[in-house]
Design a protein with these regions (language model features):
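N-terminal Rossmann-like NAD(P)+-binding subdomain of aldehyde/semialdehyde dehydrogenases
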Residues: 1-120, 147
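Solvent-exposed alpha-helices and their adjacent loops that cap or buttress functional pockets
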Residues: 111-112, 120-126, 149, 180-184, ...
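Conserved C-terminal structural/oligomerization subdomain of aldehyde/semialdehyde dehydrogenase
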Residues: 127, 322-454
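Flexible, glycine/charged-enriched surface loops at secondary-structure junctions
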Residues: 27-34, 181-188, 263-270, 297-305, ...
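Conserved small-residue-rich beta-alpha loop and adjacent elements
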Residues: 93, 97-177, 181, 230-234
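ALDH superfamily catalytic-core signature
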Residues: 4-8, 136-155, 169, 173-180, ...
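General beta-strand structural signal in soluble alpha/beta enzymes
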Residues: 107, 157, 190-192, 213-216, ...
């Protein structure tokens, strides 16, 4: 029997989403929390089953890469897909953390009374149906389903095909555990078709989704931003900068640079461009770049001043850096590559940040209060840090729990996309018969009588 065309397949999955989303929006906090804890217990109980499914995914990835790439690349691809018991424990812990977070739905964010007696309040409500397209591991799958459930949204999830069996094994247990705790059937939808067209049809589904979140590389984000027919929550390729001021604690700043770049080089909030005040460059840069090159195998691309300084290191046996191209200053690398530039002062650093595209995360390493305050005031980013690793631009670092990525948008969500960012606000107004004036002149005896009522 021939397969259903991809468009019909996606349309069929989305058909009942709006109805189920209305049910999810009305669930009480205790029911959702109980379900999330049951889901955590089920993942822990299904550990062997999940790892067995993952082993099949790993074998499939290994076979697909055998004839196409070098052994090193094949090993890297296999390592990326393989899950361990530690990953299962992390999934379980994340589910329990989400269960323990306050329920944002129904929270009153503000309330006031008008002179005419109107009692006005703003209340948080779910967004509705949220699509998530991920190129990342099953940890992102679970975060997406858990956060959408907790915030009263229905999640339509399309994961990376290389984890297809792993996703199915995890999702089956989660679904059964959730339904046993009173969650409606169809509380989330998993798109299982591996074709890219399935993701494209989801992006183009228009009014079937209220928002969409891409989790992956620059190519995915660009495709979603260009073709989506609904609001998109994601970072728009914004860069992460770190400026080292001339007044700084050098060991502290060096540790921040290393952590920001190598703790997770592929993350959106990993360091892309390092700006160093030139007076301390000779003292600050050589030890840091030496570690990045030799210890962490980071490719360093430097401005002319930086390459001239570090060129002396190459003569003494160290791996050297390469000259930076113009495009490097505008690139979100999401990998083991770092651009380094020596600047004259804070003015030049700020001008560089403004002149090279959107900024997602910005850090200043300084002991000078005035410099710190100016930097935080003038840099336009989702987060601006003082003497803190850029990797801490995340929901858990802020005490907000897990997140479904970072957003660089100026509208709705800017920064980590956590529970609160998966809701919107509506106005709830109580009154006692207040009318908009002037009220229409009565045209009949009945109208006149109604207006005279106390």
């Amino acid at each position: 029997m021939p397969e259903i065309p991809v468009k019909l397949y996606v349309d069929h999955l989305l058909k009942e989403c709006r109805h189920v989303a209305r049910q999810l929006a009305l669930l009480s906090g205790p029911i959702k929390d109980d379900a999330l804890r049951a889901m955590a217990d089920r993942v822990a109980a299904d550990e062997e089953l999940i790892l067995a499914a993952n082993s099949k995914d790993v074998d499939a990835v290994g076979k697909s890469y055998e004839k196409e790439v070098t052994k090193d690349r094949m090993k890297a691809a296999v390592a990326r897909v393989r899950m361990t018991p530690d990953h299962i424990k992390e999934i379980v812990e994340r589910l329990r953390v989400v269960a323990d977070l306050p329920d944002p739905v129904g929270a009153v964010t503000s309330r006031w009374e008008r002179p005419n007696g109107l009692q006005v309040s703003r209340v948080r409500v779910p967004i509705g149906v949220i699509g998530v397209i991920s190129e990342m591991s099953p940890l992102v799958t679970v975060d997406s389903l858990a956060l959408c459930l907790k915030s009263g949204n229905l999640c339509v999830f399309r994961g990376a095909p290389e984890w297809s069996l792993t996703h199915k094994a995890i999702e089956k247990g989660l679904h059964e555990a959730a339904e046993q705790r009173g969650i409606p059937a169809g509380a989330w939808v998993l798109i299982e078709r591996p074709e890219k067209e399935a993701a494209i049809e989801l992006i183009r589904s228009g009014k079937s989704l209220d928002a969409i979140i891409p989790r992956g590389g620059t190519g995915l984000r660009k495709a979603v931003l260009e073709h989506a027919k609904m609001p998109v929550l994601c970072d728009d390729g914004g860069l992460t900068y770190l400026y080292v001021d001339e007044d700084t604690d050098i060991p502290l700043a060096q540790n921040i640079v290393i952590n920001s770049k190598v703790q997770s080089a592929g993350a959106a909030n990993a360091l892309d461009t390092l700006l160093v005040q030139q007076f301390i460059g000779r003292q600050f840069l050589p030890p840091v770049i030496n570690r990045l090159l030799d210890e962490f195998k980071v490719e360093v691309r430097g401005c002319p001043k930086t390459t001239a300084l570090i060129g002396q290191m190459a003569m003494s046996g160290h791996t050297s850096i390469i000259p930076a191209m113009d495009a490097d200053w505008c690139t979100q690398f999401q990998g083991p590559v770092l651009a380094v530039k020596m600047v004259e002062n804070l003015d030049e650093a700020l001008a560089h940040i403004v002149g090279h595209g959107p900024c997602l995360t910005a850090v200043i390493a300084t002991t000078r209060y005035e410099s710190a305050m100016r930097f935080t005031r003038e840099v336009d980013a989702s987060a601006v840090f003082v003497n803190v690793s850029s990797r801490l631009n995340a929901g858990d670092s802020y005490g907000m729990g897990a997140d479904i990525g970072l957003s660089g948008s100026r509208l709705h969500a800017k920064g980590p996309i956590c529970l609160e960012q998966l809701t919107c606000e509506k106005y709830v107004v109580f009154g006692s018969g207040q009318l908009k004036v002037p009220h229409p002149v009565p045209e009949s005896y009945f109208d006149a009588i109604m207006l005279k009522r106390p």
